[in-house]
Regions:
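Short amphipathic alpha-helices within nucleic acid-binding modules
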Residues: 27, 86-91
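Short, charged/polar, Gly/Pro-enriched secondary-structure boundary elements
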Residues: 55-60, 121-124
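Core segments of cupin and vicinal oxygen chelate
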Residues: 8-9, 15-58
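Helix N-cap motif at beta-to-alpha junctions
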Residues: 20-21, 82-85
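Short, charged/polar surface micro-motifs in flexible loops or helix N-caps
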Residues: 54-58, 67-69, 85-87
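Short polar/acidic secondary-structure junctions
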Residues: 40-42, 54, 67-68, 104-106
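Vicinal oxygen chelate
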Residues: 2-7, 13-16, 39-40, 47, ...
């Protein structure tokens, strides 16, 4: 096992598979309020689209997967920070987002959190910042 460090310094982009990039852009930008940071051709048949909350360093690439790979319905493992998880839960629910029925409160050290699903059924988590 190597003891030398790599030059990897941060998480820059995570990929979420979607069936329709335009529908995903509408959800992540118009419904969640993210910024669209990139939307460029990627090869002959694809686009590279990145979205992110306004102040975030890490982006989400919403990508159509290659043929034969599933588009959506995955547990992404993505946790989004919120200063007020209760307000965001109510707000997303009012916007018609598929959110959990209520905010989970498991007690310390786990902060209050809830999960929601994008139009392709990909699950993301909102966690209250500490």
């Amino acid at each position: 096992m190597s003891t030398t460090q790599t030059r990897i310094s941060q998480i820059g982009t995570v990929v979420v598979p979607v069936s329709d990039q335009d529908r995903a852009i509408e959800f992540y930008v118009d419904t969640l309020g993210f910024e669209k940071r990139a939307d460029v051709p990627f090869g002959d048949r694809y686009r590279w689209v990145e979205v992110a909350p306004a102040e975030a360093a890490t982006t989400i690439a919403i990508a159509v997967p290659p043929p034969g790979k599933p588009a959506g319905g995955v547990e992404t493992g993505i946790g989004l920070n919120s200063a007020d998880v209760d307000a965001d839960h109510a707000d997303l629910k009012a916007r018609g987002v598929d959110v959990d029925d209520e905010v989970s409160r498991m007690g310390d050290p786990v902060p209050p959190l809830f999960w929601f699903r994008d139009p392709d059924g990909n699950t993301l988590m909102v966690v209250e910042s500490r």
